[in-house]
């Protein structure tokens, strides 16, 4: 495994696969290292939302970065379908944030006003109960209204990951599976050399660390301290029922196959990906308050997965000052930002720079 490539991407999840495909489409020789099924794969339990309303408030660079990603999602879906024949389940047209009290309505009203004041290029309207009932007639009596944005949407995260990796290989990329990167070093003649626990090595002129929570240790080896921590999210899924919800929402999403996802939680549970009855019951209570008919649905599965959280919750995009050519990319919005990672960041990294990634998203903003 000594073939040298131009760009070596560590991490075969949504972030790494999107970057690798984008770089390969640019013409770079790219190798993607995938740890395999032992990885804490966030896409396995992702809610599948492309969610922009309210994102980045108080952080203008992140807000504009996220909105740009939302604008690029139709293009990403179209290209992947053309290159792979895989329909990733993209559905745009807006998303709903349901409100179950007048105080929640007031909070959404304030969010919309703040979003407008900060210059967000997204249209968010607040629907009262009557207006909401016209487009979602099955809402329960406790629902007071909802905010509806124009950029929010949804996609199937597993199909998106599959399509990205297939398209990557069709564009000449090399996918190496069951390679759990453990060590990184720089050599004058070989560039960056990455080895696994077995001593196997792969080298590349440049390297991108997109290994999720594994980035903590890998980044340390290139001189960066990230302070990433896991945050567990649990999701519940029902059996297939007749279509009733054509918009994705903050707590409830009906897939095109008919199943309903209820979620998700935000928990400090270490590296546990388990579930608990209390959280599952809370998610079900919220779902049935919004749509009482869900009380008749049969629950078939619940699961947990880990989000990758930086100290302030925002992404990190950085080139290691001590080891130029080594880049770190990490975020907890792998679905939302996949379009931007694939269509703009990946091509930039193929050329040896971070392109449009905001400088304010370097790890130097933390006092670690």
Swiss-Prot record:
Q: Which GO terms describe its cellular component?
A: cytoplasm
Q: Does the keyword Oxidoreductase apply?
A: yes
**Name of the molecule in the record:** Opine oxidase subunit B
EC annotation from Swiss-Prot or TrEMBL: 1.-.-.-
What Pfam families is this protein classified in?
Answer: DAO
Q: Which GO terms describe its molecular function?
A: oxidoreductase activity
Subunit info? Heterodimer of a subunit A and a subunit B.
Q: Which UniProt keywords apply?
A: Oxidoreductase, Plasmid
Q: Which organism is it from?
A: Rhizobium meliloti (strain 1021) (Ensifer meliloti)
**Which pathway is this protein engaged in?**
Opine metabolism; octopine degradation
EC top class, as a word:
oxidoreductase
Q: What does this protein do?
A: Oxidative cleavage of octopine into L-arginine and pyruvate.
């Amino acid at each position: 495994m000594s073939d040298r490539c131009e760009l070596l991407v560590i991490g075969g999840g949504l972030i790494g696969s999107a970057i690798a495909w984008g770089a390969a489409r640019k013409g770079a020789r790219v190798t993607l290292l995938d740890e395999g099924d032992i990885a804490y794969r966030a896409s396995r339990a992702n809610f599948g939302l492309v969610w922009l309303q309210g994102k980045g408030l108080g952080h203008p660079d992140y807000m504009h970065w996220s909105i740009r990603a939302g604008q690029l999602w139709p293009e990403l879906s179209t290209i992947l379908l053309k290159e792979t024949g895989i329909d990733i389940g993209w559905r745009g047209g807006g998303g709903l944030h349901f409100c179950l009290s007048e105080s929640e309505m007031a909070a959404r009203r304030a969010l919309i006003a703040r979003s407008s004041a900060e210059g967000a290029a997204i249209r968010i309207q607040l629907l009262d109960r009557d207006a909401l009932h016209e487009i979602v007639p099955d809402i329960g009596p406790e629902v007071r209204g909802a905010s509806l944005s124009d950029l929010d949407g949804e996609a199937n995260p597993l199909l998106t990951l599959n399509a990205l990796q297939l398209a990557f290989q069709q564009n000449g990329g090399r996918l190496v599976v069951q390679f759990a990167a453990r060590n990184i070093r720089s050599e004058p003649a070989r560039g960056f050399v990455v080895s696994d626990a077995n001593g196997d090595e792969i080298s590349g002129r440049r390297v991108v660390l997109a290994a999720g929570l594994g980035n903590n240790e890998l980044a340390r080896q290139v001189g960066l301290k990230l302070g990433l921590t896991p945050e567990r999210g649990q999701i519940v899924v029902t059996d297939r029922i007749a279509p009733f919800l054509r918009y994705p929402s903050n707590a409830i999403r009906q897939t095109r196959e008919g199943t309903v996802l209820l979620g998700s939680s935000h928990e400090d549970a270490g590296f546990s990906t388990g579930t608990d009855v209390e959280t599952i019951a809370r998610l079900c209570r919220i779902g049935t308050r919004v749509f009482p008919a869900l009380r008749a649905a049969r629950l078939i599965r619940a699961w947990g997965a880990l989000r990758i959280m930086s100290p302030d919750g925002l992404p990190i995009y950085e080139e290691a000052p001590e080891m130029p050519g080594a880049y770190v990319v990490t975020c907890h919005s792998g679905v939302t930002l996949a379009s931007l990672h694939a269509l703009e960041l990946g091509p930039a990294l193929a050329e040896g720079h971070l392109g449009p990634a905001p400088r304010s998203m370097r790890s130097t903003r933390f006092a670690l």
